[in-house]
Every structure is written in structure tokens, then in C-alpha cells.
Amino acid sequence: MDSSQHHPWVGNWKLESETGFVDWLIAQGATTAEATAERDIIRRHTTLTIAVDDDRVDLIWSTNIRGRLRRTKTVLSYSLDGVSVTTTDTPLGSVSATAAVEQDMLVHRVIGPRGTETHRRHIVGGRLHQTMTTDDPALSTTTCELIWRRTR
């Protein structure tokens, strides 16, 4: 079976709208200016590709700002068993993450210096809804939602 039929969130996505993302980034330690700039770059210049191969999922973030020398591509690859840990270095420090398919959702659990984050992605009305919740003991629980539209 084609993985895009089996997992409806497989494909290329552009950010369409968000609720609480800037506040979520600020809670992660970004300044208001940094958080706003990051949201704008993601909205205008970034494509998220989700690919599944066997029992692995790849999240590929491609950013291309025309007229500037800013092209980045970040690939995060996870086992979909919900147990195997992938460790990644971030500006906030080292984080460990797992991935799993729960019902119709792609779920990542990320443990880092600021506590645990849960990222859930699922399809609603043809759009990819991504909900991110941070449970930081020093902060109240923070949640945001990103809505992505399919490209190509």
C-alpha cells in the first residue's frame, strides 16, 4: 500500500495559519522579535515534507529565501515504534525524541532542557493540524496549533 494512502499526513505542506505559535516560541526562550521572525520565515519560505519508509518517518524542513543566501534543509528521522530514541542538538540543548502512530495521528514526544513536548499531527478537512504542547515545570503548560495546507 502507498504510504500516503496509509498515512494521510505524508506529503509536502506549507504553513497556512497558526494559533499561539509566537507565544509558544517565547515560552521556549525566544524573544518576541525572534519568535515573530521565525513564524514569518516558516509561513513564507518553508516547506515541511513528511515521508514514511518502512517503519521510519522523516520530517524534512526546507527553507528557501529568494534573493538571499539562506537555504536550509533539516532532516529529522525517527523510528515509528514509539520506543527508539533519536537525539538531536538544538539551540536550547540536546533533546531526545520518539515517534509513533497513534490512531490516525503522527505523535512525537520530545524531552529536553525545558521539559517534555508532545507534537501531534493529523488531518482535518484536508489540512494537516499540528498541535504542540509543552509541559515545563517552570512554566504553565503551553499549547499552540499550526495548520498546514498540502502542496503539489
Model-predicted segments: where are they?
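Hydrophobic small-molecule pocket/channel-lining residues, especially in calycin-type beta-barrels
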Residues: 1-152
